[in-house]
Amino acid sequence: MSRLCGIFGKPYIDLSELVDTSGFEAIDEELMCALPRVEPSYTGGSLKWMGVTAPWVDADPYADYMRVIEGFSREQLVRFVSYGKAPEGFDPDAADQHHHFGDETDNPLSREQMLYLKYRYGVYFPWKVCYHLLENDRWEDKHSGDGKDFTEEARRMFPRTVAFIEQLPFQEIGRCVLFGIEANDHAPAHRDSEPGKALAIAQSISFDPRGNKRFYVCDPKGENKTIVDAPIYWFNDMDYHGVDPDPFFRYSIRVDGVFENDFVERIRAAQRR
C-alpha cells in the first residue's frame, strides 16, 4: 500500500490545541452574512490541464476548461474570447498562437467566460465561491508577504475574520483565500506540489469554522484516505487532497505564509504529548 507524505508521521496536524477556536461560531456568522455582499469568483476548473490531479481524477468525466478550449475551432475560440478581454496580440488566424486562459496564466477568465464555459460546454468548476482576503499574483509567491495586505473590502466586510487571521502564528502571510463548495459539488483529488521536488513542507493553516467540510488527504493510489477531523489544521500539500460532496454549502479558509520561528517546534512538542 502506498503511503501519505504527511507531517511528523501523521496524515495532518490538528492545531486546535495551539490556536484558540472559541470565536469560530461568531466568525462563521460574520462570513455567511457578508459573503452575499461581495463578489466571489470560480476556480479549479483547469486542474487536469495543469497536471496536478490524481490519476483517477484525470480519467473522470468532469470537463476541464483548458482541455475544452484547446479543442475549439476558430469560430468557437473567437466567440469564447468575446466574453472577456482578448489576450495581447490575439489573432485567431495565426496557426502558431497557443493562448492559455484562467488560473496561473496571463489571461484570467472573466465572469462571463466562466459562465459560458459552464453553460455551453459543461465545464466543472469545483470552487464556485472563491474569495481572496489577501491576494497573491502567482502560486509561486503564496508564501511571501512582501508588499501584500488584506484588501480594504476584506477588512471592512470581515473584520472579525481578518483579526483572527492576523493573530495566527505567521511571520508573513502571502495568500488568504476562502474556498467555498456548492451543495453536491466536490473538489477533485489534487496536489499543490510534487514529492521530491519541494525542499520543505509548505507552511499553511486551514480552518473550517463550521466543521462540516469533508476535506481529505489520500495516498498516490487513493487507497489510504483520511478525512480531516479538526477545526483548524496544517496538511502536507504534496499529498493528494480534495473534498467529498454533501447536500449543502461548505467552506474553509486557507492561509499560506511563513510560520513564526518557534511554531514548528511547538507543534512537534504537542505531538509528543
Predicted features along the sequence, with ranges:
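Asparagine-centered strand-capping/turn motif at beta-strand->loop junctions
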Residues: 241-247
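Short Gly/Pro-enriched loop/turn and capping motifs at secondary-structure junctions
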Residues: 210-213, 240-241, 260
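Short, surface-exposed charged micro-motifs
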Residues: 177, 204, 242
